């Protein structure tokens, strides 16, 4: 039976742990939240922190607001790879950074304490709790997200240029303006909002013992989102391979083109069109390797053999493209 570590924690308790080291892995999809989702989050948090628009009705000892699960597993580098919760965790980081940018310059005692707590959520700290602002608690390696560096730069510096238009930048600006409006409207409440978010908003971290277990949990919990497919995992292996060769951008474009092609060809009952392509290529490889067993192993199990060696060469990727072209035109030319 798979072992799970599940322990409900406040935002502050989870983010400020000394060992907290989150990674948005390369097989995840790019950040997708926009102003609509950020507005909903802001409104929900405000209504929770100030019930009936009254600061004094909040009970800091008992009031809690559940933000949802964070499904992770510890990879070989000791980082917690985020399988589920990427969008809300990223957005919470942007929100806290926006609070820090505003409160960090204030000299009021409560603002100073609040800023200290936020520092411990965003950056790694020394034994005295002082932050190393070059060492974030979260990193992103999302393969197809060209704007991820903007996210990391926002967390490190809190600044933006006018030319930065990513979802990260737009949402950060959104929160900055909401905080300005909040301080202008409720100046006496300024110290309570971020503290109540950090101390009383609850996340449910679920740490699985392996990637496969984490993905299964995600698929079970997430009935609204789009679970990661086998092809997403395979894409990460190709991405690492081509990045090491200095051909990352070329690969990303070819992969996007292949996705478009497969979407127009395959319409599987289960799985994604890209999963269907990998399934058909698996049968080709099984025949080429002389595998005669009538029992077909699971798709991911087949490709992950020998540390995904089949996905770490140029020919496999070219064969996949050729196979998709064949399905479109009827001419599959695979090289051995």
Q: Residues of each region from the PLM?
A:
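Flexible phosphate/Mg2+-sensing switch loops adjacent to catalytic phosphate-binding sites
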Residues: 56-57, 63, 103-137
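Short active-site loop/helix that positions an aromatic residue
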Residues: 88-105
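Phosphate/oxyanion-binding loops and surfaces in catalytic or ligand/nucleic-acid-binding neighborhoods
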Residues: 48, 99-102, 224
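Phosphate/oxyanion-binding active-site loops and adjacent basic polyanion-contact surfaces
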Residues: 33-45, 63, 87-88, 164-172, ...
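Polyanionic (Asp/Glu-rich) segments that form extended negatively charged tracts
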Residues: 137-336
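Short alpha-helix boundary/capping and kink motifs at helix termini
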Residues: 1-83, 93, 191, 200-204
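Short, compositionally biased low-complexity segments
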Residues: 4-22, 125-154
């Amino acid at each position: 039976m798979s072992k799970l570590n599940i322990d409900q924690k406040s935002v502050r308790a989870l983010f400020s742990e000394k060992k907290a080291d989150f990674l948005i892995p390369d097989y995840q999809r790019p950040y997708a939240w926009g102003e609509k989702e950020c507005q909903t989050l802001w409104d929900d948090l405000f209504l929770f922190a100030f019930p009936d628009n009254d600061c004094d009705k909040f009970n800091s000892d008992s009031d809690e607001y559940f933000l949802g699960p964070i499904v992770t597993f510890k990879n070989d580098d000791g980082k917690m790879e985020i399988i589920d919760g990427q969008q809300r965790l990223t957005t919470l980081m942007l929100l806290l950074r926006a609070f820090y940018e505003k409160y960090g310059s204030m000299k009021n005692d409560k603002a100073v304490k609040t800023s200290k707590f936020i520092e411990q959520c965003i950056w790694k700290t020394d034994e005295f709790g002082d932050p190393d602002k070059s060492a974030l608690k979260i990193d992103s390696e999302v393969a197809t997200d060209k704007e991820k560096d903007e996210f990391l730069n926002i967390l490190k510096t809190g600044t933006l240029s006018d030319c930065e238009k990513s979802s990260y930048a737009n949402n950060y600006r959104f929160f900055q303006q909401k905080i300005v409006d909040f301080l202008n409207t409720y100046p006496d409440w300024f110290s309570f909002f971020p503290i109540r978010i950090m101390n009383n908003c609850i996340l449910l971290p679920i740490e699985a013992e392996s990637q496969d277990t984490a993905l299964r949990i995600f698929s079970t919990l997430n009935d609204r989102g789009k679970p990661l497919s086998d092809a997403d995992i395979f894409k990460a292996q190709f991405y690492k391979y081509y990045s090491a060769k200095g051909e990352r951008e070329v690969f990303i474009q070819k992969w996007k083109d292949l996705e478009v092609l497969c979407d127009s060809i395959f319409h599987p009952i289960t799985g994604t069109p890209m999963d269907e392509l990998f399934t058909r290529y698996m049968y080709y490889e099984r025949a080429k390797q002389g595998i005669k067993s009538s029992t077909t192993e699971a798709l991911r199990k087949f490709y992950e053999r020998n540390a995904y060696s089949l996905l770490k060469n140029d020919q496999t990727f070219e064969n996949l493209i050729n196979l998709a072209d064949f399905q479109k035109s009827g001419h599959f030319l695979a090289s051995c």
